[in-house]
A protein has these predicted regions:
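Membrane-embedded alpha-helical bundles that constitute the cytochrome b-like, heme-associated redox core
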Residues: 1-122
């Protein structure tokens, strides 16, 4: 006599890739935050204030824009993994879960495009 629904048996490494990806994106975000904090401290110690010119000046070099874009993409991927897991774990109706996943993807893609547009307009 079987009790409950049959469950699909998955491999031992189920979820490992997502766990590693989330840790990697967290390391990228921490490294960028450290870089950003050091930049702010250097500007504050040399100029005494942090105005628009200093903020915009940080994103003038292409390497700075690329680093910021990598950090933004890492943040968005980190958010995707987390939100996908929340929707998959806590939203039971398949239709609602699918709708939430699609809305999340669309929102994150919009944020990525908007961030790139802002970065390259400086």
């Amino acid at each position: 006599m079987a009790i409950g629904a049959k469950r699909l048996v998955v491999g031992a490494h189920y979820g490992l890739r997502d766990w590693l990806a989330q840790r990697l994106t967290a390391v990228i975000l921490a490294a960028y935050a450290l870089f950003f904090a050091i930049y702010v401290l250097i500007v504050l110690s040399t100029k005494g204030a942090l105005g628009y010119d200093e903020w915009a000046g940080m994103f003038v070099p292409v390497w700075s824009k690329v680093l910021a874009l990598i950090a933004i993409l890492a943040l968005l991927y980190h958010a995707w993994i987390g939100m996908r897991d929340v929707w998959m774990d806590y939203v039971r109706p398949t239709g609602i879960r699918l709708a939430l996943l699609v809305v999340t993807i669309l929102w994150l893609v919009f944020c990525a495009l908007w961030s790139a547009q802002i970065l390259w307009s400086v």
